[in-house]
Amino acid sequence: MSDLWNDLLGCLDLAPCEPDTWEGRSQQLEYRRLFGGQLLAQFAVAAQLTAPGKGLKSLHTQFLREGRTGEPVRYETEVPQQGRTFATVRLTARQERGVVAVANASLHVW
């Protein structure tokens, strides 16, 4: 596998920081801005870590400002609804300068 592919896969390994908070490193790209697809993938991973046993059904995201590759992204999660088969997770992606993106995820037991 190429180094770029391994770097991307490593970004999906989120670390727990505090309750309901995860941290992910950024893929090192030449233009020093976060790739939106990386944020989407990390949102999906954070949602599934927050509601274990459920698969992602939908993810709605708003990108609020550019993120920077030189610093980690912190994912804060909130679960407004969790039942036996469905869950809803609100996610906020933050860096030093503030909120980078927000998302709402719907998860379901398949």
Predicted regions and their residues:
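Terminal targeting signals and extreme-terminal segments of soluble enzymes
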Residues: 1-110
